[in-house]
Curated annotation (Swiss-Prot):
J region of the variable domain of T cell receptor (TR) beta chain that participates in the antigen recognition. Alpha-beta T cell receptors are antigen specific receptors which are essential to the immune response and are present on the cell surface of T lymphocytes. Recognize peptide-major histocompatibility (MH) (pMH) complexes that are displayed by antigen presenting cells (APC), a prerequisite for efficient T cell adaptive immunity against pathogens. It comes from Homo sapiens. Alpha-beta TR is a heterodimer composed of an alpha and beta chain; disulfide-linked. The alpha-beta TR is associated with the transmembrane signaling CD3 coreceptor proteins to form the TR-CD3 (TcR or TCR). The assembly of alpha-beta TR heterodimers with CD3 occurs in the endoplasmic reticulum where a single alpha-beta TR heterodimer associates with one CD3D-CD3E heterodimer, one CD3G-CD3E heterodimer and one CD247 homodimer forming a stable octameric structure. CD3D-CD3E and CD3G-CD3E heterodimers preferentially associate with TR alpha and TR beta chains, respectively. GO terms for cellular component: T cell receptor complex. This is T cell receptor beta joining 2-1. One of its GO terms (biological process) is adaptive immune response. It is found in: Cell membrane. The keyword Cell inner membrane does not apply. Keywords: Adaptive immunity, Cell membrane, Immunity, Membrane, Receptor, T cell receptor.
Length: 16
């Protein structure tokens, strides 16, 4: 992905 932000184990916010 273009930008990936991890906020915890198994949690990911992907901004395309």
């Amino acid at each position: 992905s273009y930008n990936e932000q991890f906020f915890g184990p198994g949690t990911r916010l992907t901004v395309l």
